[in-house]
Amino acid sequence: MRAGFRQHFSPRRQNESHPMKKIEAIIKPFKLEEVKDALSDIGVEGMTVTEVKGFGRQKGHTEIYRGSEYTVDFLPKIKLELVLPDGRVDAAVAAIVKAAKTGKIGDGKVFVSNVDDAIRIRTDEKGDAAV
């Protein structure tokens, strides 16, 4: 490994704080626009959206196709990923939960984890400036 690479991209030490967090939200597909608008209203400018399939307590559901009944185990969901400065995370999570909630099983989950660093490839900006 090149010495310069290690120095420039060294991992954060365990006792250092994490100034950024990654929010991953799994939501119902029809709630995407509502969640996107809620995040935009609080100034969140970027996110990654992926179509995913999964199940939790909701499990699958039964459908009939050409006269045969079968169980659909994996349900279509949307996964949102965004990285924000630590101070903006609570507002973003609250916006996601409020906009995604139907009150019914299968509304989804929100996960928040630490992000050690971010690098904008085009400009080499790091940390908050990169997100």
Name the predicted role of every residue range.
Residues R2-V131:
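Positively charged, small/polar-rich N-terminal and surface patches that mediate targeting and assembly
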